[in-house]
């Protein structure tokens, strides 16, 4: 997918070097089509890395996508240069009068805290409330998915005895579902979290359906039947080395964490991790953009409503 981003954004060079089609504003204006407007609320600490990962996955179908990066005002990232944030990010207050075809709410390393204790919780709930009338389809990832299920449906998260970390096999519950179309009977996705949501709680909500799950990692994809809200409990956007970097970070902090499962060759942390989820991740993000956003969003973006 031709993705429209500033040429100065680090992802522009990274993706161009990977032969992914990116374009600047002047090139985009020569294409007489309405681009999909996608906002990304980036709550990850390493924002540039998260940008690269998500933009890579938004670049795989033949539609033009215009991306707007959003940061919280109530909490300023400590791990991303302020110059980068000032140049490429905007605040919710600056875009709340706009409509978007899609919104991605990322994960964040705050899952062991109560939702209400998180510095930017009130701001996040305001954004999620706004998304119901101003965004056609919202994709929530990992902690963002837990936060979305809690806010919209009062579904609780539960602390695990040990952190789930690794790459796990998953199956599809409905082979005809749009979001999982094209996936193999068994496919792989990374998970990295200390908490979970329970299947029985989701099954109580008639508006929701579980589209994919795993014996080891539990629920993966939950979606509303109208596909206006999507929840990924894992991290399909992760790069080859993301789990490795998180594992090393946790060890340096003195956390008692296990080696990520099904990831390192022979569990050797000095080996190059096996990248076994790239194909399935491309399919999943492509399906969201195509079936949940492009095929159903109004041509006139101002017609988006609840």
UniProtKB/Swiss-Prot annotation:
EC number assigned by the record: 2.3.1.31
Marked site (Important for acyl-CoA specificity) residue numbers: 111
Any GO MF annotation of the entry: homoserine O-succinyltransferase activity
Binding site for substrate: 163, 192, 249
GO BP annotations listed: L-methionine biosynthetic process from homoserine via O-succinyl-L-homoserine and cystathionine
Reaction(s) catalysed by this chain's protein: L-homoserine + acetyl-CoA = O-acetyl-L-homoserine + CoA
Pathway field: Amino-acid biosynthesis; L-methionine biosynthesis via de novo pathway; O-acetyl-L-homoserine from L-homoserine: step 1/1
One annotated Gene Ontology cellular component of this protein: cytoplasm
Keywords: Acyltransferase, Amino-acid biosynthesis, Cytoplasm, Methionine biosynthesis, Transferase
Subcellular location field: Cytoplasm
Catalytic residues of the enzyme: 142, 235, 237
Site location (Important for substrate specificity): 192
InterPro entries: Class_I_gatase-like (IPR029062), HST_MetA (IPR005697), MetA_family (IPR033752)
Chief subcellular location: cytoplasm
Family: Belongs to the MetA family.
HAMAP family membership: MetA_acyltransf
Stated role: Transfers an acetyl group from acetyl-CoA to L-homoserine, forming acetyl-L-homoserine.
Stated name of the protein: Homoserine O-acetyltransferase
Species, as recorded: Clostridium botulinum (strain Eklund 17B / Type B)
């Amino acid at each position: 997918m031709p993705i429209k981003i500033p040429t100065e954004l680090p992802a522009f060079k990274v993706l161009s070097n990977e032969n992914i089609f990116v374009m600047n504003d002047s090139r985009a204006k020569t294409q007489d089509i309405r681009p999909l407007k996608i906002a990304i609320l980036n709550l990850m600490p390493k924002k540039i890395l998260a940008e690269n990962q998500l933009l890579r996955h938004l670049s795989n179908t033949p539609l033009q996508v215009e991306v707007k990066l959003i940061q919280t005002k109530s909490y300023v990232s400590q791990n991303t240069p302020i110059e980068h944030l000032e140049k490429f990010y905007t605040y919710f207050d600056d875009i709340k009068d706009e409509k978007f075809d899609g919104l991605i709410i990322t994960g964040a390393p705050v899952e062991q805290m109560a939702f209400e204790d998180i510095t930017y919780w009130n701001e996040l709930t305001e954004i999620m409330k706004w998304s119901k009338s101003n965004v056609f389809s919202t994709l929530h990832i990992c902690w963002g998915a837990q936060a979305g299920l809690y806010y919209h449906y009062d579904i609780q998260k539960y602390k695990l005895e040990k952190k789930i970390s690794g790459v796990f096999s998953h199956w599809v519950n409905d082979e005809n579902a749009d979001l999982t179309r094209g996936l193999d009977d068994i496919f792989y996705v990374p998970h990295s979290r200390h908490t979970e949501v329970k299947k029985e709680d989701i099954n109580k909500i008639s508006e929701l359906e579980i589209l994919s799950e795993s014996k080891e990692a539990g629920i993966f994809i939950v979606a509303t039947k109208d596909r206006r809200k999507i929840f990924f409990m894992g991290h399909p956007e992760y790069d080859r080395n993301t789990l490795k970097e998180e594992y090393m970070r946790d060890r340096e902090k003195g956390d008692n964490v296990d080696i990520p499962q099904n990831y390192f060759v022979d569990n050797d942390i000095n080996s190059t991790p096996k990248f076994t989820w790239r194909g399935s991740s491309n399919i999943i993000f492509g399906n969201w953009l195509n079936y949940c956003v492009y095929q159903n969003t109004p041509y006139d973006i101002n017609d988006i409503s609840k």
